[in-house]
């Protein structure tokens, strides 16, 4: 490890607000005295038990508490786990965004959807350009990833230089643009780097990550071997290089290309408009035009590679897509690997497609956009940091990168595995976690942001598991005498027509309860509701071993 040049004795605070010990929701604050810059601002997708939740974004309480210090956001690339929370966060902290051209283009579309395009300042940054904000100077470095225009960041502070790789791979033969700027990593390394924050996603995988161009050869073989079939290819919408290679194959084999899926249409529109996607004249057709061409002259590029229930491919598979129906002998290609948690959904879609007679190809048509072990070692050798700080990944991924650092000669004192919320204070003299800040999940449900918490989720889980029983009764004002009811309405508990005797017995339990309350002159609504819930709940549990949500409703006349 090379000793860094002696720096100011002040300490840089590195505060991950999300993205550690998880996949997604990446966001990290860098603080020095009265300046804070934020690197990326991503979302994650809900866990299976987050019923009804659309998105999960980071809790930015710490940034709001220090809003006067926050100078800007630096974005490494345009994936949802790095930009998805921007519209929500910038409604509360409106500071400039700095990113490369394509990344800004994707962010612009998001801001436009939220009506924020005129209120948020964005600046396109070129590779090699430096941005000065407060105590910081930030340089963008060319990298490769599964989306174009990805960048690493060299963050210059009075305490030293921190290199943040963002999501990256080492690709010497990219489909578009230049290879990763390894020379610049080496030049910065010679200056003396305090810390390297390196992508850990593939830290468990040995070897080097394959070039994106290798997928092009596989795709070409598929087009060659399936000349007589319609081809449908599902991939990540953001993988513009993959889309480019599919279009290249389509042109070579004389096929028209139809794009399906909202996110796919959006990304292709942005990428082609900004010059990141080359579209031969007249190669694109609308999905409605497919019927005008023989199957062997068409290819459909679609969303749904992860088995998402509402994505285009899923709707094709289950027969609910209005414009595309799966035909026997269709060739369907999954040009992706299932992300953790989506394996079951992907397998289900593959089975449905095969049942319809389609030929499904789902192996060896994808390469990762993340660095494997040898790529990570290469970056370490070039940057030669004093401290290793693994980022981006679950705990096991962070540990895997820590082991790589150990193999390269780093002792445990110079490897910092952080958790979201940790405050790492670091300079030339040392690095230590000195405290924690508040972090957590903010759930987005439709137009509601943060108004759904664990209590609401528990209610939804209970409703999903055991259903609901509503007890309706009418009482006379003043005397509290029962005039009508109690009547029972249930949903998701039992099928009433097949459980009439159970419901009759439940009605008897309620009648007995109300008679007892009347005899005891109980007129307090709160007491009545509690007694009704307890009596009915005990009966239902005894008879069914279920605990539905019970809601008594009292009307007074």
Protein language model regions, located:
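Short glycine-rich phosphate-binding loop at a beta-alpha junction
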Residues: 96, 389, 551
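C-terminal tails and terminal domains of large nucleic-acid-associated
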Residues: 521-557
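Conserved hydrophobic residues forming the short capping helix/wall of the S-adenosyl-L-methionine
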Residues: 111, 405, 540
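His/Asp/Glu-rich metal-coordinating catalytic cores
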Residues: 2-74, 79-292, 311-325, 344-347
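A glycine- and charged-residue-rich anion-binding loop/surface
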Residues: 20, 44-48, 52, 69-70, ...
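Hard-cation-handling environments
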Residues: 205-335, 339-521, 529
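Residues in well-ordered beta-strands of folded domains
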Residues: 15, 31, 139, 301-302, ...
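Conserved beta-strand scaffold positions in the cores of enzyme catalytic domains, especially
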Residues: 14-16, 122-124, 195-197, 332, ...
């Amino acid at each position: 490890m090379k000793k860094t040049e002696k720096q100011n004795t002040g300490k840089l605070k590195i505060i991950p607000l999300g993205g550690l010990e998880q996949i997604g929701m990446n966001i990290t604050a860098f603080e020095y005295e009265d300046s804070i810059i934020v690197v990326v601002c991503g979302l994650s997708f809900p866990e299976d038990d987050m019923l009804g939740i659309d998105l999960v974004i980071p809790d930015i309480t710490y940034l709001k508490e220090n809003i006067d210090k926050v100078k800007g956001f630096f974005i490494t690339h345009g994936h949802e786990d790095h930009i998805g929370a921007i519209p929500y966060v910038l409604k509360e902290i409106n500071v400039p965004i700095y990113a490369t051209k394509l990344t800004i283009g994707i962010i612009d579309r998001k801001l436009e959807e939220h009506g924020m395009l005129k209120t948020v300042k964005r600046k396109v940054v070129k590779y090699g350009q430096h941005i000065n904000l407060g105590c910081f100077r930030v340089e963008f470095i060319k990298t490769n990833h599964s989306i174009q225009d990805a960048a690493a960041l060299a963050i210059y502070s009075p305490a030293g230089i921190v290199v943040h790789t963002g999501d990256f791979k080492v690709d010497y033969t990219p489909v578009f643009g230049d290879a990763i700027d390894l020379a610049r990593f080496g030049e910065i390394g010679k200056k003396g780097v305090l810390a390297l924050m390196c992508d850990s996603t593939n830290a468990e995988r040995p070897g080097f990550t394959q070039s994106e161009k290798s997928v092009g050869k596989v795709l070409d073989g598929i087009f060659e071997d399936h000349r007589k079939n319609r081809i449908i290819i599902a991939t990540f919408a953001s993988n513009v290089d993959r889309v480019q290679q599919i279009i290249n194959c389509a042109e070579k084999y004389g096929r028209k290309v139809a794009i399906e899926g909202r996110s796919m249409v959006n990304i292709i529109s942005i990428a082609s408009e900004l010059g990141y996607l080359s579209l031969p004249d007249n190669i694109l057709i609308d999905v409605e035009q497919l019927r005008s061409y023989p199957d062997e002259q068409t290819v459909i590029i679609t969303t749904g590679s992860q088995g998402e229930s509402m994505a285009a491919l899923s709707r094709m598979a289950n027969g609910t897509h209005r414009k595309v129906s799966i035909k026997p002998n269709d060739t369907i290609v999954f040009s992706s690997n299932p992300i953790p948690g989506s394996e079951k959904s992907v397998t289900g879609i593959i089975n449905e497609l095969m049942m319809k007679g389609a030929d499904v190809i789902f192996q060896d048509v994808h390469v990762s956009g993340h660095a494997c072990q040898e790529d990570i070692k290469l970056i370490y050798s070039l940057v030669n940091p004093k401290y290793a700080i693994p980022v981006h990944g679950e705990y096991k991924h962070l540990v895997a990168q820590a082991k790589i650092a150990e193999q390269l000669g780093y002792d445990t004192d110079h490897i910092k595995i952080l958790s979201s919320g940790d405050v790492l204070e670091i300079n030339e003299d040392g690095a230590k976690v000195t405290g924690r800040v508040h972090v957590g999940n903010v759930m987005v449900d439709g137009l509601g942001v943060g108004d759904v918490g664990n209590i609401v989720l528990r209610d939804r889980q209970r409703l999903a598991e055991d259903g609901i029983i509503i007890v309706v009764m009418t009482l006379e004002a003043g005397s509290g005498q029962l005039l009508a009811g109690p009547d029972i309405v249930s949903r998701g508990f039992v099928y009433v027509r097949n459980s009439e005797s159970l419901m009759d017995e439940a009605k008897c339990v309620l009648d007995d309860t109300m008679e007892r309350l009347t005899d005891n002159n109980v007129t307090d609504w709160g007491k009545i509701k509690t007694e009704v819930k307890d009596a009915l709940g005990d009966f239902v549990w005894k008879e069914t071993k279920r605990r539905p949500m019970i809601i008594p409703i009292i009307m007074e006349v």
